[in-house]
Amino acid sequence: MQRTYCPRCGGKLEKRMHEGRERDWCPACRVMHYDNPVPATAAVVLDHRLDLLLVRRGQEPGRGKWCLPGGFQETGETPEQCMLRELAEETGLQGRIRGLVGLEMGQNPFAGEVLVAGYCVDAVGGALCAGDDATEAGYFPLERLPELAFRSHARIIERAAAPLRPRRRFRGLPGGAYVVTSLDHLAVAREACRGGARIVQYREKDAPAAQRLATARAIAAVCRESGTVFLVNDQLDIAALSGADGVHVGQDDVPVEEARELLGPGKIIGVSCTSLEQALEAERRGADYLGVGAVIATPTKEEYPVVGLEGLRRICRAVAVPVAAIGGINLQNAAAVKESGAKYLAMVREFQEDAAARVAAVNTIYKK
């Protein structure tokens, strides 16, 4: 900010070099004045599809362009209070702060240098409606954002989007083989990745926790090297500690929302379903994909009702998220299961031997 007179005594200021910068100096009261950035906040609000909430600015700077909800911090309020107030004023939404994304510097032609604190915020109430100096409010895919008003906001978005890569990458994953490990889990995972598996799920319930974690970490490393999605069955702690891309849970396990709360917004969450009702509910709760089965009677899923190809077809038509079919699938019936709408074919026994070749065979079905 440009100053002419001393705010202490009213005397005329002079420019002096001090500590490597040109600063305002008052010769009357012999005080050096320092410029400090103005504090502001910005909210990163994502919906269950990972679309980002933006508002269109109704005034300068950046009038007509889009930005994150936020604004300048007022005296007497904390940055967190400022963030929630601005979110409510500009979008009509009530928020709950998940955490700090980071701090970025920006320039404002009226306020000078601005220190922007970006927060990840969950929308927990209210109705979306533009207000205050925002003329519009809406959600946008991270891959197709409109022109942004502030570079500081763009950098905050980049920071917030980085941990979301597993879920974002999962959206573009091609269909094919979904390998559920058994027996020698690491060996199966290695062969699965060598054959081009789309997804590897580590399912082990009987080994000691320390052994399960060590195995999961080893599989995670193999999957990272090959670019294969790695999930852990049921165990959120093992998934988090091993660096897995996500977790697969059953109907009686931790709900999707709580799993998301524990693992963070970037992890993939799949849910087992045996009926259309369960599938629709899991999708509503924010599941990234559905594991549907048993499609055909199988000894590894004896406690599950048989969904059948027609039941699988109904579910695939009713939901927007991808479906992984499981239960009784082998290379002989894989094509028929794929034709029912399943994006992934999940198998256990079929991949216990010659996993690489059988994975490649399944993927070939999806290329036809």
Predicted regions and their residues:
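Alpha-helix-loop-beta-strand connector modules within alpha/beta enzyme cores
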Residues: 213-231, 251, 257-274, 305-325, ...
